[in-house]
Amino acid sequence: MQLHRINTMDLKHSLRDLCMNPRHTSWAAPLLILGDAVLCALIIWRVPYTEIDWTTYMQQISLYISGERDYTLIKGSTGPLVYPAAHVYIYNILYHLTDEGRDIFLGQILFAILYLATLTVAMTCYRQAGAPPYLLVPLVLSKRLHSVFMLRLFNDGIAAFAMWVSIFLFMNKKLAAGVIVWSTGVAIKMTLLLLAPAIAMVLVLSLSFGPSIRLGFLAVLIQVLFGIPFLRNNPAGYVSRAFELTRQFMFKWTVNWRFVGEELFLSRKFSLALLALHLLLLGLFVATVWLEPSGSNLPSFLQRLIQRRYRTASLSKSFVMTAMLSSLAIGLLCARSLHYQFFAYLACATPFLLWQAGFHPILVYVVWAAQEWAWNAYPSTNASSLVVVLSLAAQVFGVLGNSFSRKHLDQSSQKEHMQ
């Protein structure tokens, strides 16, 4: 009886160590990726491809190949070209690789490789940030994420890959390379602009103000270089189409705000309220979570920065990853409208953010599962859209609240030490 009890305790200890000890991620990650590769093959083999934008992409590329450089005249069956120039160049390559877009099967294989590459980089970031192995499992179980990459062939998959590569580079202090890859991602789809506030903080904390400004100019220069063929022809048309910020979203496609009703969704007041919330949350994160490595409050930090007396901080990999993913989550929470393909950016970020929020592993899985259900509900419902917003709120306010809790504990321990 006692031996059985000891064996049970040993088993529990071993299972806990397997789930919680970060050293196990070095072998767990390759096994999960290998298993997911098999799953990808099964999906391509068994699940029918769904045509949404691929044909339109190919029609637009056909016009580009024929010599059209006026962005306002490049269109397809489902609408005009509304993505920056790097999207055109990448799908131009895919156009030629897939027999002008006709070889869908090859396209799916290429996107499966892209998916596995994205997953590999994301898991590498998790491992370097010291995340426990149990967080890796949800990364390979997302039905919607597999769909975005392999069954839809959306450009969001390519942009998500660029996002994770840039996060990896910033974590490893390859700041210039990180800026180049991130800006290239923005030139595929400007959703990656949501990471800009955190990237600015990482650069300023790591390099101070002057060098950060230079890297900011580098990011802008990359956008100009990508856009040159179109800027020469119709600069206003290119900028207005590729970086349109005033687009009117359709209520029937929204994943996140269906529960507020169409009248409120379409109102200018709602749009301004979301913008105000976005700015407020960014301000809170700058003043608390993202400023933590500087060891000072916001006024003194700004004063030292202006007076050029700021000493650069050494940023942990976990901090960099948290900053960039929380900036993404804030942007998605306050987004005017989310569509299903946006899950390409969020899917691999959620487990890490919930862990950084200090949630119990069971709660991490509950919130993750609820979010996965909500993003798989088609069409979206009042209930599913509410869960989308609440799960994002859990990530954003969880990270913010955990940061406040840590600061309070640190202050309390310092007082006890002084006494």
Swiss-Prot record:
Keywords, ordered alphabetically: Endoplasmic reticulum, Glycosyltransferase, Membrane, Transferase, Transmembrane, Transmembrane helix
One GO biological process term is: dolichol-linked oligosaccharide biosynthetic process
Q: Where is the signal peptide?
A: none
Tell me where it resides: Endoplasmic reticulum membrane
- Which GO MF terms are attached to this record? dol-P-Man:Man(5)GlcNAc(2)-PP-Dol alpha-1,3-mannosyltransferase activity
KW Membrane (keyword) present: yes
Protein name per UniProt: Dol-P-Man:Man(5)GlcNAc(2)-PP-Dol alpha-1,3-mannosyltransferase
User: Which organism does this record belong to?
Assistant: Aspergillus fumigatus (strain ATCC MYA-4609 / CBS 101355 / FGSC A1100 / Af293)
Tell me what gene encodes this: alg3
